[in-house]
From Swiss-Prot:
It comes from the Bacteria. GO terms for molecular function: imidazoleglycerol-phosphate synthase activity; lyase activity. Its EC number is 4.3.2.10. Keywords: Amino-acid biosynthesis, Cytoplasm, Histidine biosynthesis, Lyase. Belongs to the HisA/HisF family. It is found in: Cytoplasm. It comes from Campylobacter jejuni subsp. jejuni serotype O:2 (strain ATCC 700819 / NCTC 11168). Pathway: Amino-acid biosynthesis; L-histidine biosynthesis; L-histidine from 5-phospho-alpha-D-ribose 1-diphosphate: step 5/9. One of its GO terms (biological process) is L-histidine biosynthetic process. This is Imidazole glycerol phosphate synthase subunit hisF1.
Length: 255
């Protein structure tokens, strides 16, 4: 059994870590480096940093904080936001990031996934998918979700896009379930299972974790990692206690 990963997500905006609910009303959560160091020292397996405004504002991620994070932690981390070219990715990887994740730029230029995979290896290339479930249960891919003024339906369905990004060379998929984001009432297991069934690469669940049981429910579907933000930032769940709980439930977890 592959070891399951517990991942903390740090949404970055204007040089600070923020957190919203359903991708809206972002509140300040603290300093990037301090939080990165805290998570590294408290048992998290991996960190994902999303510069949530970079793509919407057509900005680049600040290389300075990426480099500082790399100097201050000893765990794997992934960076996302505004990565539109091989040059952008190369700079972030050179500054210490282990992986890069693309979301809106991949929707605008799907060949970017293939180019990045060829340049840096599929293990470095994560595709983030912001998936919204409408009132009829249809799963739709949204883009530019870091700013509610720019957030819009991309015209693509989630399941079709999941298949497509794998064909193009994605090494991992993070499924951001927008309806669940920050609500803490559990991952959307129905959506997660539908995506998992067509996923041949590692799948990470994002959006909805509120208690330890929610992580267990998601992992029981077979996914590789579970990502959360609110419950970790607000210290509602202790990471080490969560890992012990999951290990006691029979999962392969790094303690």
């Amino acid at each position: 059994m592959l070891t399951k990963r517990i991942i903390a997500c740090l949404d970055v905006k204007d040089g600070r870590v923020v957190k919203g609910t359903q991708f809206k009303n972002h509140k300040d959560m603290g300093d990037i480096i301090e939080l990165a160091r805290y998570y590294s020292q408290n048992g998290i397996d991996e960190l994902v940093f999303y510069d949530i405004a970079a793509s919407a504002r057509k900005e680049r991620i600040s290389r300075e904080w990426v480099s500082e994070v790399a100097k201050n932690i000893n765990i794997s981390f992934c960076v996302a936001g505004g990565i539109k070219s091989e040059e952008d990715a190369a700079e972030l990887l050179a500054n210490g990031a282990d992986k890069i994740s693309i979301n809106s730029p991949a929707l605008n230029d799907p060949s970017l996934i293939t180019r990045l995979a060829k340049s840096f290896g599929v293990q470095c290339v994560v595709v983030g998918i912001d998936s919204f479930k409408d009132e009829n249960g249809n799963l739709k891919v949204f883009q530019y979700t870091g700013d509610e003024k720019t957030s819009k339906h991309s015209g693509k369905s989630t399941l079709e896009w999941v298949k497509k990004v794998q064909d193009l060379g994605a090494g991992e998929i993070v499924l951001n379930m927008m309806n669940q984001d920050g609500v803490k009432n559990g991952y959307d297991l129905e959506q997660l299972e539908a995506v998992y069934k067509i996923c041949k690469v590692p799948l990470i669940a994002s959006g909805g974790a509120g208690k330890m049981e929610h992580f267990l429910e998601a992992f029981k579907l077979g996914i590789d990692g579970a990502l959360a933000a609110s419950v970790f930032h607000q210290k509602l769940i202790d990471i080490k206690e969560l890992k012990i709980y999951l290990k006691n439930q029979g999962l392969s977890i790094r303690i």
